[in-house]
């Protein structure tokens, strides 16, 4: 199986505070890799380094065999890396459709009819077709989270970084979100998904990586990882 992403000895410190320490792992094409860890484990910092928003102090990031460690965010987006945010950041006075158009044109490299067709497919995939003409700033929570996912998908990513989309959702809404994510994977998109809800990660991912204090604690099959004593200790204490 081909590896789309390789991370080698990635570290980040802010002054004297080490938030990521010697992270090394790889992601296979077409898989959903889940990431869990308590607050302060370094999950969001890792996403920042992968997407280009945060420069690592040390280490290397290879995307499809190319070293992107020093590449800016917009170049990584053009190469096929997109991410969502815990707090959605749409253009509130623009429609759902127009938000996706911005992503499809400026990051996805599409224009004209090609952009329109891709946006319509993205809306259908994420269950947002009927909200196409709604103002993004007026959407309810569930729809807002789907819209955040749709904006990232509109960029035509090869690798999609999903950051805690299930917070505040009901169990049924989380189940629906998992189905959407799996549909996106079936479109050929590789996914790395950060989430606090362990049950979601076990049911949605192919492999699971546990972080603690900026280090990789374990990586493997989801049920195997969550049953490890060291992972239980991080979440439940001694």
Where are these predicted regions, by residue range?
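Glycine-rich phosphate-binding loops of nucleotide-dependent enzymes
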Residues: 2-238
């Amino acid at each position: 199986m081909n590896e789309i992403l390789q991370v080698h000895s990635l570290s980040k410190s802010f002054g004297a505070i080490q938030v990521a320490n010697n992270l090394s792992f790889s992601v296979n094409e077409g898989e959903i890799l889940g990431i869990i860890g308590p607050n302060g484990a370094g999950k969001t910092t890792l996403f920042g380094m992968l997407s280009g928003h945060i420069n690592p102090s040390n280490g290397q990031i290879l995307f499809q065999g190319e070293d992107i460690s020093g590449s800016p965010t917009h170049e990584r987006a053009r190469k096929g890396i997109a991410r969502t945010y815990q707090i959605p950041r749409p253009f509130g006075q623009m429609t759902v459709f127009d938000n996706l158009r911005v992503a499809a044109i400026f990051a996805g490299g599409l224009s004209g009819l090609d952009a329109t067709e891709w946006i319509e497919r993205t809306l259908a995939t994420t269950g947002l077709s009927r909200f196409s003409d709604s103002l993004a700033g007026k959407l309810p929570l569930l729809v807002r989270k789907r819209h955040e996912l749709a904006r990232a998908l509109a960029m035509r990513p090869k690798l999609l970084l999903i950051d805690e989309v299930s917070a505040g959702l009901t169990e049924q809404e989380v189940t629906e979100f998992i189905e959407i994510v799996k549909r996106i994977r079936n479109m050929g998109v590789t996914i790395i998904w950060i989430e606090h809800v362990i049950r979601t990660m076990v049911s949605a991912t192919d492999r699971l990586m546990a972080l603690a204090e900026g280090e990789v604690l374990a990586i493997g099959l989801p049920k195997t990882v969550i049953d490890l004593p060291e992972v239980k200790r991080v979440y439940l204490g001694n």
